UniProtKB/Swiss-Prot annotation:
Comp. bias intervals (Pro residues): 42-53
BP GO annotations: cell-cell signaling involved in cell fate commitment; maintenance of root meristem identity; phloem development; regulation of asymmetric cell division; regulation of cell differentiation; regulation of lateral root development; regulation of root meristem growth; regulation of root morphogenesis
Organism expressing this protein natively: Arabidopsis thaliana
Cellular component GO terms held in the UniProt record: apoplast
Signal listed as a keyword: yes
Family assignment from sequence similarity: Belongs to the CLV3/ESR signal peptide family.
Name assigned to this protein: CLAVATA3/ESR (CLE)-related protein 18
Modified residues (Sulfotyrosine): 76
Length: 101
């Protein structure tokens, strides 16, 4: 009985040793299991994204300045400058007869 328990412990120990040593070897050289990893050279695109051209940046700025705001737009820099309840827009002339203006 003691011999059987010793054999089981020995087999489990050998299996754990083989697994851990193979994991260490694969981490050092992934090509052992057929993984050919190529490390890119040059600037890292995740941490150093290319900057937009000045022409493109200017076009975006012009587009942002010409945005038509909706009647319920809130300017978050000045909280009380625009109140959609008190400053509601006038109805279009086409629909004035529907509301009695």
């Amino acid at each position: 009985m003691h011999l059987l328990k010793g054999g089981v412990v020995l087999i489990i120990t050998l299996i754990l040793f083989l697994i851990t040593s193979s994991i260490v070897a694969i981490r050092e050289d992934p090509s052992l299991i057929g993984v050919d990893r190529q490390i890119p050279t040059g600037p890292d695109p995740l941490h150093n994204p290319p900057q937009p051209s000045p022409k493109h940046h200017h076009w975006i700025g012009v587009e942002e300045n010409n945005i038509d705001r909706s009647w319920n737009y809130v300017d978050y820099e000045s909280h009380h400058a625009h109140s959609p309840i008190h400053n509601s827009p006038e109805p279009a002339p086409l629909y004035r007869h529907l509301i009695g203006v």
